[in-house]
UniProtKB/Swiss-Prot annotation:
Pfam families: FloA. It comes from Dictyoglomus thermophilum (strain ATCC 35947 / DSM 3960 / H-6-12). Homooligomerizes. Found in functional membrane microdomains (FMM) that may be equivalent to eukaryotic membrane rafts. FMMs are highly dynamic and increase in number as cells age. Flotillins are thought to be important factors in membrane fluidity. It is found in: Cell membrane; Membrane raft. The chain crosses the membrane at residues 4-24. It is a single-pass membrane protein. It comes from the Bacteria. This is Flotillin-like protein FloA.
C-alpha cells in the first residue's frame, strides 16, 4: 500500500514539474541571473498568463542591461509589447543612439515605434544621412526653353519630429516645386546650364524641411538636360489658332456675301416682274387716254417715236459694250 502511495506521489510531482516548467522557462531565468538581471519566477509565470513571449522580453532586457540602459525595465518592455510595438527594435535603437551620443529616451523611442516609424532606421539615418533621388522635374525658363533636372537630396532623420512629421514624399514634392520655381524665374536656360548650383542654393534656402521628419543636409543637381522649345511651340499653336479663327471669320463673311447676293438677285427678279406687270398697263392706259381725249393721235405717235428712239439707243449702247469687251480680250 505504501508503495502505491509513493508511486502516485511521484506521478503528481512529475505532473507538477511538467506544468511548472511549461510556464517557467528555466533556461531563460538562469540566463537572466547569469547576466545580472533580477527576474522573479512570478514575473515569468505572469508573462505566460498574459501571452507575452518571455524570450523576447528577457533577451531585450538583458541586452539593455548590458548596454547600461538603466531606464529600460521589465514592465516598460512588456507594456510596449502588449501595445503592439517591436521591443527588440526599440532596444536596439536605444543602444545605437547611446553609442552615437543622440539623446533618445525609451518613451520617445516607443512612441516613434508605435507611430509606425522604423525607430532603428531613424537612429541610423541620424548618424549616416540618407540620399533621396528625385524624379526628373521639367520646367520652362522665361525664354521658352524647357529644362529637365534631377536632384539628389541628402537628409538626416530628425528624432524630435519623427512623430507627426511628413515623410520622404513631401521632401521630394517640395524640392521639385523649388526646382520648377528656380528654373521658371531664370531669364534664359543658358543661365541654369552655366550655373546649375544656383538651383540647389535657392532651393536649400527655402527651408523645405519644415514640418517634416527630416533635416535637409544638402541638395545636389545630378543632371540637367535641355528639352523642347516650349515657347516656340506655343507661338506656333497660337498662330495656327489665329489662322483658323481668321479662316472661320472669312468663311462667315463669304457666306453672308453669298446670301446677300442671292437676296439681291431675288429682289431684282421681283422688281423686274413688277416692271413687266406695270408695262402691261401702259397700252391700256394709252388706249384709255385716246378714248377719253386726253391725248391726241399726234401725241400718241410722238410717244411711239420716243420709245423707238430709246430702244434703238439701248441697242447701240449694248453693241458698243460688246465691241469694247472684244477689244480687251
Amino acid at each position: 500500500m505504501s508503495l502505491l502511495w509513493g508511486f502516485l506521489i511521484l506521478i503528481l510531482v512529475l505532473i507538477f514539474l511538467g506544468i511548472f516548467f511549461s510556464f517557467v522557462p528555466l533556461g531563460l531565468w538562469i540566463s537572466a541571473l547569469a547576466a545580472g538581471v533580477s527576474i522573479k519566477i512570478t514575473d515569468l509565470i505572469g508573462m505566460r498568463l498574459r501571452r507575452v513571449p518571455p524570450g523576447v522580453i528577457i533577451n531585450s532586457l538583458i541586452k539593455a542591461h548590458k548596454a547600461g540602459l538603466s531606464e529600460v525595465t521589465l514592465d516598460k518592455l512588456e507594456a510596449h509589447y502588449l501595445a503592439g510595438g517591436n521591443v527588440d527594435k526599440v532596444v536596439n535603437a536605444l543602444i545605437a543612439a547611446q553609442r552615437a551620443g543622440i539623446p533618445l529616451t525609451f518613451e520617445k523611442a516607443a512612441a516613434i515605434d508605435l507611430a509606425g516609424r522604423d525607430v532603428l532606421e531613424a537612429v541610423q539615418m541620424s548618424v549616416n544621412p540618407k540620399v533621396i533621388e528625385t524624379p526628373v522635374v521639367a520646367a520652362v525658363a522665361k525664354d521658352g526653353i524647357e529644362l529637365k533636372a534631377k536632384a539628389r537630396v541628402t537628409v538626416r532623420a530628425n528624432i524630435e519630429r519623427l512623430v507627426g512629421g511628413a515623410g520622404e514624399a513631401t521632401i521630394i514634392a517640395r524640392v521639385g516645386e523649388g526646382i520648377v520655381t528656380t528654373i521658371g524665374s531664370a531669364e534664359s536656360y543658358k543661365e541654369v546650364l552655366e550655373n546649375p548650383d544656383s538651383i540647389s542654393k535657392t532651393v536649400l534656402a527655402k527651408g523645405l524641411d519644415a514640418g517634416t521628419a527630416f533635416e535637409i543636409v544638402s541638395i545636389d543637381i545630378a543632371d540637367v538636360d535641355v528639352g523642347n522649345n516650349v515657347g516656340a511651340r506655343l507661338k506656333m499653336d497660337q498662330a495656327e489658332a489665329d489662322m483658323r479663327i481668321a479662316q472661320a471669320q472669312a468663311e462667315s463673311r463669304r457666306a453672308l456675301a453669298i446670301a446677300r447676293e442671292q437676296e439681291m438677285k431675288a429682289l431684282t427678279q421681283e422688281m423686274r416682274a413688277r416692271l413687266i406687270e406695270a408695262e402691261k398697263e401702259v397700252p391700256l392706259a394709252v388706249a384709255e387716254a385716246l378714248r377719253s381725249g386726253k391725248i391726241g393721235v399726234l401725241d400718241y405717235y410722238t410717244l411711239k417715236n420716243i420709245m423707238a428712239d430709246t430702244a434703238m439707243r439701248e441697242a447701240i449702247s449694248k453693241l458698243g459694250q460688246k465691241e469694247e469687251e472684244g477689244r480687251k480680250d
